[in-house]
């Protein structure tokens, strides 16, 4: 199993015009892990940045760890390989280091990423993520991807997958939203107890209902004490919990700042204070899919 680099560059909501440069800056600064997805509709631009840096000799392909995700409209077994090949072509790569099932929910196949009925609810596909997983395993066997994993799975869903009869390849990670306001302790303990790593997306929070994690008084106090930025504290917090972290930025100075997190350590008291901020505040709730049989957030974790 490949070791996933601890800090990666997230590319969600990075506009195509900005993301090529962001990737090039990141590679120059030492990033080797890049988190992509079909849904972000910017994979070809990410690929351009990677290709240029390989061509310049700054980095070799085997030094990079490139992740992408299978979108929900491709959960039918017969569509999984097509989706993966589309992503590989967009990124201009021969293989992915890691391919994730983006959400446990399958949607009706077609040209709409999120097919909705008249009442604004998602139209599901009649698929099971357990069947989808078999097609994911085939991708590893065929050499298109090196590792496979999941994203946004709750503990029951992950448990069902790990206990699937005839499981050939285990998921190596569960990529989930995680920050001090949603610290995910139960789910992380569950994953780590079963040798599944956890990758934290939205580690810097972002905003919903005007909630800005970076303005939190406790986080600012700890940042000041260490002479670091709030973002660096939020990233370091997850590293010390043995998580992989994928902060997103297209700003060169923030891309640099987000990886300068290995020259200091949070104290036990800092960690306790950060953990105590939990308020179960989920930002990525995907409300149009709440009707789906595999919606992951109806249970506690």
Curated annotation (Swiss-Prot):
It is found in: Cytoplasm. Its EC number is 1.1.1.263. InterPro entries: AKR (IPR020471), Aldo/ket_reductase_CS (IPR018170), NADP_OxRdtase_dom (IPR023210), NADP_OxRdtase_dom_sf (IPR036812). The keyword Cytoplasm applies. Inhibited by p-chloromercuribenzoic acid and alkyliodines. Pfam families: Aldo_ket_red. One of its GO terms (cellular component) is cytosol. NADP(+) binds at residues 35, 175, 246-258. The keyword Oxidoreductase applies. It catalyses: 1,5-anhydro-D-glucitol + NADP(+) = 1,5-anhydro-D-fructose + NADPH + H(+). Substrate binds at residue 102. Disulfide bonds: none annotated. Keywords: Cytoplasm, NADP, Oxidoreductase. Its main location: cytoplasm. The active site is at 40 (proton donor). GO terms for molecular function: 1,5-anhydro-D-fructose reductase activity; aldose reductase (NADPH) activity; oxidoreductase activity. SUPFAM superfamilies: NAD(P)-linked oxidoreductase (SSF51430). The record marks 69 as: Lowers pKa of active site Tyr. Catalyzes the NADPH-dependent reduction of 1,5-anhydro-D-fructose (AF) to 1,5-anhydro-D-glucitol. Belongs to the aldo/keto reductase family. Monomer. This is 1,5-anhydro-D-fructose reductase.
